[in-house]
């Protein structure tokens, strides 16, 4: 575009756009936000709105599109959801006061991690943005949720651990240094950057001194020691950079972020992303929703704050029995006091999302409806606090926050804010009558102009005695008094003639001019005055930010603990004994999700007992559909529930604290990375073997399925041995398998115990009993299961024939292998698998390759005799029969 064609407005737009090249610029023009050039083309396509142009007759028109300012939030949310950043550029000057171009500037940058509008956020999940930085000693991570004020930091030793931590926390956006990928290992581990919207900051924004000073300035402190992060330099660097990023996006200080909390991975039960997915903690594998996941059973919270805390507790179970039992004490009280618990939950139902309301208020994004919701929530506190203090003893249920009912804040909102306040803060209609005398007067002028004019007219008629006197208005003279000419002799001396007409005279008075000043612009003054009063109320509320934060925190905990008590009561859960022992003993345990998905049916409970003395590895065999996977998962879920502080679905439960849970359940191809099902399976298994400890719980559901039978069996056998012998202590493991040969491990490994899922056979049918019983089984019932699945009868019949042939052949193979191998050492597999074909297999191969059409009868008889002799003498090393027969051919 040539310079002469650039208008001042376009020049202003281009200047602001140059500062935000990676964002779609919402440029405020009157009642619309306009977008131009490439932004308009992108936004029109993403939002499905009309793309038009500015200066259509120009040979090079400017593409443009726009959205109404009052509905802009919805359009912004849609763009952000599609991965765009949006820079909101507002008019920061009253157009009536502008002597030229209205001043504009970007007031907010909205990104996936910077959303504040609760309508476009998942109420049950935090909306974190994460910053990561590498350095000597590992990786520093910081997570900040601008919508709640939560600010968490940690430091880990490896990029792989950082990657897993990011997956577990689930941020919506990443912030990385520009040269982050120069660390090749970090770049590989942090491939999350390819899956999440990622912003880059200059390296200097992550520097030690700069980030530390930024945190000290924000928290108004001289040291970071009080936050416990002074010895975490990488975490400090990540936190300082993230704070800078958020402040830049919001264009202001984020005063509602009042603390920063350090945490460490070894404080919590480690559940990697693969295990969390396999166990379906937060979403099911089928379609990624909550239905059918553990969270759907446990999350009976009634507030958004409680739902977010429940999700966090499920992702971060504890490993400290003392803290776990403190939670269990509170849940037990909530379970036992059902009537009080229900009253508490009823009160909580009236509480809105105080955390996000507090944040919106602090950042200047709250409207009248937000304050009304906050006031309605705070009204519940006196009743709620009284119920807690009078009935519960747990400090988690009646903390010090119960001494503060925030009645002063609730009263302020109740007196000032209308319940039916409009969504806009500059439209008026927010403040209740009677709260401000000046506003009441201005509002009266704005809403009752006709009545005031009639009153003034009646007053002047009475004062002058002129019955034809009228008070009128036009745009030229404003308000005036009109008197017919035949009565002008009676006008008072303070009337000033303004205009002479044929039949009347028009006058003004000082009182009328004062009235005009009040009435004209009364609506504008009312709206402006309301906004000023509203901001004063907001400032007073923001002054109580710490009190609101404490109340929100306690409400979330009360909601979670009451919900867990409710679930335990209604589902028949028991309180687990959680200690530092090495025992896992679940009596009559059930799968918490599956039992809820069997309406009208009884879930078959099972006893699961493990320890480090004589029953550490449970080798579980049995047919498909019998329930092996269910038993495995329910054990892991019971441990997770116990260590998060929940009761568990069992008659009795003893849980020696577990530090890590690993699962290897099923596998999917990772074709985009060139990885097969078997490779994925082996990677998951390698992760387990390289990271277990003697306090871990390992769940293995079929190892070695993605390769040949003998390879798979060999790997499964070796994995089981490794876990049994791990550092002389072993690892508690539940190992489901169809390799019945693995049951022989009990002969050489004392802490391996065989179990199977019982079935009954009747008339060639199988009945699944779903009971875990001691002992192994050598039957898989695969053909029966195939028949249940609807495989055609002809295929079933043929399957039985093939199975019989294979079983007969296998019996011969086992007999030969046992005879050939002799006695084996303690660590040897009891049935050795030959690496070479047996003589019988070689004979079969030779027969298959022979061409009898070119052989004489005598040659055929000689070859047949030779093959027969070799099969009869298996103890002799197999010769290359194939080569010999080829020579004879």
Curated annotation (Swiss-Prot):
The keyword DNA damage applies. Keywords: ATP-binding, DNA damage, DNA repair, DNA-binding, Nucleotide-binding. GO terms for biological process: mismatch repair. SUPFAM superfamilies: DNA repair protein MutS, domain I, DNA repair protein MutS, domain II, DNA repair protein MutS, domain III, P-loop containing nucleoside triphosphate hydrolases. Residues 869-889 are annotated as: Disordered. Pfam families: MutS_I, MutS_II, MutS_III, MutS_IV, MutS_V. ATP binds at residues 622-629. GO terms for molecular function: ATP binding; ATP-dependent DNA damage sensor activity; damaged DNA binding; mismatched DNA binding. GO terms for cellular component: cytosol. This protein is involved in the repair of mismatches in DNA. It is possible that it carries out the mismatch recognition step. This protein has a weak ATPase activity. This is DNA mismatch repair protein MutS. The gene is mutS.
